[in-house]
């Protein structure tokens, strides 16, 4: 894809000019999604948001990434709305993890798909989530990212009880959420 052209050097599809036109054809939406993830990694919030919006997708990874863009520019109400919408799109709990994904037996994961302890310790000590969500992330990892972002947005909106409820769902193990709860209790 060229910087100004469509996929593989072809012309930009007409549908790309209007996010309301629905999902884009072929590889174009996938390339825009990948470009959005790259922009998120560089904290180029506006460019990332534009890429995700232009895909026309309304799936969980796209909505989460758009929410992360909103969080990056302190638009917490929209961040919260988008991450809640993304959560509703996750597949229901109880469905088996596909082979080859984190948490499946051949990957050495536990039945619940938990990360090994060194990763969990590091994740719990880190601040608010800042990493984009790729497509295909295992459901339990996607849910954790979404809950952590929703807790952070809710805290900044002063929604104390929601933050406490999310902390409990996550086992009260994330430092950035526990810090908010301590601030609320002062």
Outline where the language-model segments fall.
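Boundary/linker segments of alpha-helical solenoid repeat arrays
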Residues: 60-65, 89-102, 172-185
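Flexible helix-coil transition and linker loops at the boundaries of alpha-helical arrays
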Residues: 20-22, 52, 91-140
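Alpha-helical segment of the N-proximal tetratricopeptide repeat
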Residues: 22-54, 149
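"A position-specific structural signal for the A-helix of alpha-solenoid helical repeats
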Residues: 27-30, 34, 65, 142-152, ...
